[in-house]
Swiss-Prot record:
UniProt region (Disordered), positions on chain: 40-61
Record Pfam families: Ribosomal_S21
InterPro entries: Ribosomal_bS21 (IPR001911), Ribosomal_bS21_CS (IPR018278), Ribosomal_bS21_sf (IPR038380)
Basic residues biased stretches: 43-61
Protein name in the entry: Small ribosomal subunit protein bS21
Gene Ontology CC, one term: ribosome
Family the entry assigns: Belongs to the bacterial ribosomal protein bS21 family.
Keyword tags: Ribonucleoprotein, Ribosomal protein
Species assigned in the record: Ligilactobacillus salivarius (strain UCC118)
Keyword Cell wall biogenesis/degradation listed: no
Single annotated GO MF: structural constituent of ribosome
Gene Ontology biological process: translation
Length: 61
C-alpha cells in the first residue's frame, strides 16, 4: 500500500501527484484491475499464450 504524507507548505495537488506516481511505480492499480474479476485458469493460459505470441511477432519485425 502506498503512503504519502503531506509535507509542510505543500499543496494538496502536489501531494496527490506524488501519491499517483508512487502508485503507478509499484503497479498497485494494474494489479487491482487484473484481479478485479475472477479469471478462469484456462483464460489465464490463453492470455499468457497470446501475449507470448505478440512478443514473438514484435521481435521478428
Amino acid at each position: 500500500m502506498s503512503k504519502t504524507v503531506v509535507r509542510k507548505n505543500e499543496s494538496l495537488d502536489d501531494a496527490l501527484r506524488r501519491f499517483k506516481r508512487s502508485v503507478s511505480k509499484t503497479g498497485t492499480l494494474q494489479e487491482y484491475r487484473k484481479r478485479e474479476f475472477y479469471e478462469k485458469p484456462s483464460v489465464k493460459r490463453k492470455k499468457k499464450s497470446e501475449a507470448a505470441r505478440k512478443r514473438k511477432n514484435k521481435r521478428r519485425f
